[in-house]
Amino acid sequence: MSAPIVAIVGRPNVGKSTIFNRMAGERIAIVEDMPGVTRDRLYAPAEWLNYEFRMIDTGGIEIGDAPFLAEIRGQVELAINEADVIVMVVSGREGLTEADEVVARMLYKSDKPVVLAVNKVDNPEMRHDVYDFYALGLGDPFPVSGSHGLGLGDLLDEIVKHFPDEAAEQEDDAIRFSIIGRPNVGKSSIVNAMLGEKRVIVSDIEGTTRDAIDTRFVTEEGDEFVMVDTAGMRKRGKIYENTEKYSVMRAMKAIDDSNVILMVIDAEAGIREQDKHVAGFAHEAGRAMIIVVNKWDAIEKNDRTMSDFENLIREEFKFLDYAPIVFVSAKTGQRLDRLPQMVKDVDDNHRKRITSSTLNDVIMDAIAINPTPSDNGRRLRVYYATQVATQPPTFVIFVNDVELMHFSYERFLENKIRESFDFTGTPIKLIVRARK
């Protein structure tokens, strides 16, 4: 059975993200005193009393005509539909508000267990402030302080009471992949088109996707994936707004937490320097890579358009010569059905292991074709090679003198390894060591 899901809902600035972060044990959600900052659902694992579960932090529900109001409402409704338990957060400091009553009315219709958390009860003298919230009709209010961690144990005790009895620890074999790229290249639209569910708010405002959101799905073939849609990463030296700066930090963490990276390029805008910076970070992290050219439907084409664009990509992204390229349209759905299988294939290659005997046969055949270089009368001698790691595949080559291994010859050996084994989509690392 999959882990139970707990949705944290409520109007803006009652401290949902603070409680979320306390339960998750790290700063997952963006926390800022600006209504509407937590605009998309955030997912994070948590554990209490040997129960593992997943939490969803939603954008707040607010009365008024704010630009994101209708979409945020929709996000909360989706979270409610997915949750096993709902935690409604209110503010003991501000007291009961009309917006709280609106949220409660939404929850009446959910037929899901609801636990009422009165946040910002930062000292015992404030505990009497919780009684007004009985008027919401959601049962006993639990006084907590997200900022100080007070009362969260009692709250978690109540939450896990509502979990199905079968809830148990599960090992996660899903393939994790991130979708990265500059703002407005269509990352969120690709997510929505692939999932068939409006899981991420999409608008034409740069930076709408403010944080990384984990989304689990299973294909018809039974392959399980966790997709992480990240905020558009800006160049690190040009980040001024606090929220955006933190989003970039989270995006980098999402890359670290992923097996495979989908690098999205805007076909209309072409390739920019920032695309190369973003791709470079993922490459340096050693992740498997796929280059996704989005908005291909908007390009006027002839019989050479695709090959010309592919050549441009290969020229601009020389360090990603191993990455397959796919031309898609999130708007029309063109070729999006290929992405899950491509992700699985490059992940398999990322995890691939080659036996030492087979590897050494390839190395020795390569040396027979192109003998090792020499310097000042001393010739490089290659003794043997072995694979020492996967993700990415990493090989150690033992030689007589590391200084004799020219970069060009190391590249030659890497190419021969790639020719012999399918490492499409994954970087490979060669480590040259002197045999003692």
From Swiss-Prot:
InterPro entries: G_ENGA, GTP-bd, GTPase_Der, KH_dom-like, KH_dom-like_a/b, P-loop_NTPase, Small_GTP-bd. The keyword Cell inner membrane does not apply. GO terms for biological process: ribosome biogenesis. SUPFAM superfamilies: P-loop containing nucleoside triphosphate hydrolases (SSF52540). Keywords: GTP-binding, Nucleotide-binding, Repeat, Ribosome biogenesis. Residues 4-167, 175-351 form the EngA-type G domain. The gene is der. Residues 352-436 form the KH-like domain. GTPase that plays an essential role in the late steps of ribosome biogenesis. Belongs to the TRAFAC class TrmE-Era-EngA-EngB-Septin-like GTPase superfamily. EngA (Der) GTPase family. Associates with the 50S ribosomal subunit. GTP 2 binds at residues 181-188, 229-233, 294-297. GO terms for molecular function: GTP binding; ribosome binding. HAMAP family: GTPase_Der. This is GTPase Der. GTP 1 binds at residues 10-17, 57-61, 119-122. NCBIfam families: GTPase_EngA (TIGR03594), small_GTP (TIGR00231).
